[in-house]
């Protein structure tokens, strides 16, 4: 890898190519255009149909049923959510009317895990009252819990480089019961990958640092982190400067948001990419090329005196002064060996089948189970990763801001029908292709069995539901969705030593390429990806 030189400024009226049109690409374009409205920016989208947003996709059926085919909420606590919301309001103030939230005390903020000792039993975690606490302690989920806590507090085991989440947790907690029975479920829900195949340095670098500083993750977690609070303030001030809004305004919004577990949009998550895209398409210097598949990228190096910028040629027919890679094709041909090696190390992402379930007039979810949904731990040996109770989330949404729309004000409860069911099931299809899946078999194996077992619906009622013409089941195969952030790739809890930081710096300073998206963000969430886009755009200035 080359030593870095001083970053040369993009020329006035220069050209920038942005690969992809997902949320990362859209926000990168927005942030860069705020700083440099003179630049000609072209987004290159592989798909021929004019839908932007990547994995974010709210589908409306011909019966106007809203189904989320990707993420459906944002975490209020994530500082990137504040950046997203402030940016969208700046683009279009009417977005305020679309913003909704879930309260911390709401049913939709409850979460369950499947008990591996009794797979038909859902156990609330964390338990919210004494009876639920006793239920948790009696379940298989609590096996080894007390021993694990004391082992972490008193163990003097030393951190190792490049540990998997599984190896780290077993070393800290003394055995694998807690990670197999509880922790693995959370990682299945986020990454759709086994904890043995995930890098601890990537997934939980803060816990790695807590162990290094305090010798125990529990002791470290109990310490007040003043550095983190100061970093948050500095980050918010950077956001405010770029968006040209008052520091105190963005700080107040973040303060309000961070106590809210979930943020959503009335018309669905596609509100987010659609708002950004509609704003960008009004700009004469921004263009989108649909049906353009980026397969090859060639960096024409700058002259020996480093006076001129390198130019980048895409597919031998488009040339740009700068290229931003938000979407990086797995088979991208590029004359940069270190990037190629990193992409090969990540390998193919996970394959997940999403099963959307909807019934317009029947509520299958009992009051005792009303929650965000449930996850399935590793010890259950099931391909079912988890189930999201969309109808519970929707019926618990509240407006984030007083509406400026009189029509909306008249209808304060925008989900008035409590007697419907909407759920999304996530099934691991790792190693399978779309053609390998029999939808009827999956309907029997996962849909029917979930209704019978976890939702405890009598078999006669389940058969009636399955044969009901109003019962909608839709399948979406998410191919190569989330990268596998494996150990030994080069992730580090020290950001300056992380392979992503090293590559970012080399690509930008030596080759005039910036990067973003899931393969370079600090985490797999939408706010993480947008913050990465913000940082990438700001580095160019």
Positions of PLM-derived features:
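Glycine-rich FAD pyrophosphate-binding loop
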Residues: 33-60
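Dinucleotide-binding Rossmann-like beta1-alpha1 core, especially the glycine-rich loop
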Residues: 62-155
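Conserved Rossmann-like nucleotide-cofactor binding loop
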Residues: 24, 49, 330
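Mid-domain catalytic core of redox enzymes
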Residues: 35, 290-423, 431-432
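Active-site/ligand-binding neighborhood in enzyme catalytic cores
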Residues: 150-293
């Amino acid at each position: 890898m080359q030593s870095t030189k001083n970053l040369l400024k993009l020329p006035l009226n220069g050209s920038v190519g942005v690969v992809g049109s997902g949320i990362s690409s859209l926000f990168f374009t927005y942030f860069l255009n705020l700083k440099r409205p003179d630049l000609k920016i072209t987004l290159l989208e592989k798909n021929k149909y004019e839908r932007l947003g990547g994995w974010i996709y709210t589908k409306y059926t011909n019966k106007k049923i809203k189904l989320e085919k990707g993420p459906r909420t944002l975490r209020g606590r994530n500082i990137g959510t504040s950046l997203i919301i402030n940016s969208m309001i700046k683009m279009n103030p009417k977005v305020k009317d679309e913003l909704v939230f879930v309260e911390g005390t709401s049913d939709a903020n409850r979460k369950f895990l499947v008990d591996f000792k009794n797979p038909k039993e859902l156990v609330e975690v964390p338990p919210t009252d004494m009876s639920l606490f006793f239920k948790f302690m009696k379940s298989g989920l609590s096996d080894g819990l007390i021993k694990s806590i004391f082992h972490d507090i008193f163990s003097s085991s030393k951190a190792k480089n490049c540990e998997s989440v599984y190896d780290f947790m077993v070393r800290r907690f003394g055995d694998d019961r807690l990670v197999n029975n509880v922790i693995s479920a959370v990682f299945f829900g986020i990454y759709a990958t086994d904890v043995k195949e995930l890098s601890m340095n990537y997934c939980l670098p803060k816990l790695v640092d807590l162990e290094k500083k305090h010798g125990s993750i529990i002791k470290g977690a109990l310490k007040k982190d003043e550095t983190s609070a100061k970093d948050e303030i500095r980050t918010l001030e950077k956001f405010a400067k770029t968006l040209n809004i008052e520091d105190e305004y963005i700080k107040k919004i973040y303060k309000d948001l961070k106590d809210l577990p979930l943020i959503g949009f009335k018309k669905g998550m596609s509100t987010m990419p659609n708002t950004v895209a509609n704003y960008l398409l009004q700009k004469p210097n921004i263009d989108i090329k649909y049906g353009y598949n980026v397969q090859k990228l060639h960096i024409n190096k700058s002259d020996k005196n480093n006076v001129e910028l390198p130019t980048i040629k895409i597919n031998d027919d488009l040339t740009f002064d700068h290229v931003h890679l938000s979407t990086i094709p797995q088979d991208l041909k590029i004359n940069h060996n270190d990037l190629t090696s990193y992409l090969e190390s990540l390998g193919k992402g996970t394959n997940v089948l999403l099963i959307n379930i909807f019934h317009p007039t029947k509520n299958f979810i009992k009051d005792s189970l009303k929650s965000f949904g449930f996850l399935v731990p590793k010890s259950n040996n099931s391909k079912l990763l988890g189930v999201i109770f969309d109808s519970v989330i929707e019926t618990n949404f509240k407006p984030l801001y007083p509406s400026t729309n009189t029509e909306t004000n008249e209808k304060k409860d925008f989900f008035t029908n409590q007697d419907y069911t909407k759920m999304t099931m996530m099934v691991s299809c790792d190693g399978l292709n779309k053609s390998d899946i029999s939808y009827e078999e999956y309907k029997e194996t996962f849909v029917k069995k979930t209704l019978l077992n976890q939702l405890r619906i009598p078999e006669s009622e389940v058969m009636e539901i399955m044969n009901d013409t109003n019962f909608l089941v839709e399948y979406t195969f998410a191919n190569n969705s989330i990268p596998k952030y494996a150990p030994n790739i080069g992730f580090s809890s020290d950001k300056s030593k992380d392979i992503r930081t090293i590559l970012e710096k080399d690509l930008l300073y030596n080759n005039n390429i910036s990067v973003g998206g899931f393969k370079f963000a600090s985490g797999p969430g939408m706010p993480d990806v947008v913050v990465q886009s913000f940082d990438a755009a700001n580095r160019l200035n």
